[in-house]
A protein has these predicted regions:
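Conserved acidic segment of CheY-like receiver
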Residues: 5-15, 20-25, 33, 64-65
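Alpha4 helix (beta4-alpha4-beta5 surface) of REC/receiver domains from two-component response regulators
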Residues: 18, 22, 77, 100-115, ...
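Residue-level signal for the "D+5" position in two-component response regulator receiver
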Residues: 35, 72-73, 110
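Acidic catalytic/metal-coordinating carboxylates
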Residues: 38, 59, 74-77
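Short amphipathic alpha-helix used as the core "switch/output" element in two-component signaling
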Residues: 51, 76-89
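Active-site beta3 strand of CheY-like receiver
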Residues: 53-65
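Active-site residues of response regulator receiver
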Residues: 67-68, 97
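The feature encodes the CheY-like receiver
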Residues: 71-72, 101
């Protein structure tokens, strides 16, 4: 796996992790989903520290998805840390939380999150969210079809 093949999910609810893994498979996301239980483990993963030191086994992600309310370090802590690390300037971060609080949405945005989505109550709605993730952040842009232009060149 390369860094372009990996998505990092920081989520402490095992049921939500299982649902997310199932939705990834159902949608056919061509990426490895690596799940960590909290913001602290996500930071260790991104640093390549401790059990995550082998980059062949734990490659850098192309996308970070985080819950907000986690036991050790929160999603806010994680976003704040990522924001201070210049090597992660281009890493898109998505918040997927059960919080409906406008202040949480605003703070996540201030800390660099590209999107804030409320965790859906139904699996099919999660599948739709994963489809959006795939389209917007996990599918490389297709090269333009220039065949009609090339046919007109002298």
């Amino acid at each position: 796996m390369t860094e372009h093949d990996t998505v990092l999910l920081a989520e402490d609810d095992e049921n939500d992790v299982l649902l997310f893994q199932t939705a990834f498979k159902k949608v056919g996301v061509p990426k490895l989903l690596v799940c960590v239980p909290d913001g602290e483990d996500a930071i260790e993963y991104l640093k390549g520290a401790g059990i995550y030191s082998n980059r062949m086994e734990y490659p850098l992600p192309c996308l970070l998805i985080t819950d907000l309310k986690m036991v050790k370090r929160t999603g806010f802590d994680l976003l704040e840390w990522v924001q201070t690390q210049t090597q992660f300037n281009g890493l898109p971060a998505i918040v997927l939380s059960s919080s409906l609080e406008e202040s949480d949405k605003r703070r996540a945005s201030e800390l660099g999150a590209q999107a804030y989505w409320v965790k859906p109550a139904h699996f099919e709605d999660l599948v739709e969210l994963v489809c959006l993730l795939k389209e917007k952040w996990l599918t490389p842009p297709q090269p333009a079809d220039l065949s009609s232009i090339q046919n007109r060149l002298p």
